[in-house]
């Protein structure tokens, strides 16, 4: 679960090529993490919390729609609709913005309310098991990860908060989440 999809410029570029640029930092780093953790991308459903595109070419930073409470509520509702349809057994939450957006949707994610990734790590709350969003969606495992677009630049921050190698920690988080899924 990412933050948002694209800018208008990059969306049209992908549309013209009839595919995403899988060599972009986000895709390249995410696919490498999944591979290292033993997860097949074909077993994944990729989506974002915020729907829509950023105007222009910028793709980093807080999504402009985050300031609009009605838009955030609509995106929350759409996210829950996706959960009802897809019934995921696990959700990998990418980046520092998304945990606080989905935290209000489940009591099991309460440690994530208002928290940044370092706060989540200090609470040892990055992996959350048996997360229930709505009664009609099976409980699932939810894991908070560094956003892959700036993964290598930000690993050092997570290493500092954890007191251990962040890359190895994230691979282990994904592997453990998959083991939990296979046990259920």
Regions of interest found by a model, annotated:
Residues 39-54:
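Short, contiguous, well-structured surface segments enriched in hydrophobic/aromatic residues
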Residues 3-4, 49, 93-98, 147:
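Short, well-ordered beta-to-alpha junction loops that form the rim of enzyme active sites
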Residues 1-43, 111-115:
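Adenosine ribonucleotide-centric catalytic and binding domains
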Residues 8-23, 53-73:
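Surface-exposed cleft-lining segments at the edges of enzyme active sites
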Residues 79-99:
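Proline-aspartate-enriched helix->loop->beta-strand connector
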Residues 7-10, 53-57, 98-103, 150-155:
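Short catalytic/ligand-binding loop motif for oxyanion handling, primarily in non-cytosolic enzymes
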Residues 38, 84-86, 134-138:
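Short, conserved loop/helix-junction motifs that constitute active-site signature segments
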